[in-house]
């Protein structure tokens, strides 16, 4: 079973500056029996990230479109190529 997790846009998935969602995702994924098939998508400027299958999304800066939409559109493109059995979204009710 492949699982994809999309963190909130401004959430850092880094041990040096992690938010509550990152800590929760890190702690639960580390003990999951699916941890090898779980991919975490997020946006951080920190080079040191938690030691899991993390994919950093760096949206293009476009003054005519929000970075949140760029961020989600990148995730959707990735999902169309590499489909997941389960998608977990955190803190983005407007999507």
Q: What is each PLM-predicted segment?
A:
Residues 1-4:
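Extreme N-terminal starter segment of soluble prokaryotic enzymes
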Residues 7-15, 24-70, 93-94:
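N-terminal strand-loop element at the rim of the active site
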Residues 19-20:
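Glycine-centered tight-turn and secondary-structure capping sites
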Residues 71-75:
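Functional cleft and adjacent loop/helix regions within the main domain
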Residues 76-94:
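Short N-terminal targeting/anchoring amphipathic segment
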């Amino acid at each position: 079973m492949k699982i994809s997790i999309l963190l909130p846009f401004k959430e850092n998935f880094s041990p040096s500056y992690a938010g509550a969602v990152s800590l929760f995702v890190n702690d639960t994924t580390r003990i999951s029996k699916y941890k090898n098939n779980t991919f975490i998508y997020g946006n951080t400027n920190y080079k040191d990230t938690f030691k899991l299958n993390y994919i950093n999304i760096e949206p293009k800066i476009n003054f005519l479109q929000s970075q949140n939409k760029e961020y989600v559109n990148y995730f959707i493109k990735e999902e169309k190529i590499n489909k997941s059995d389960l998608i977990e979204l955190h803190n983005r009710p407007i999507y």
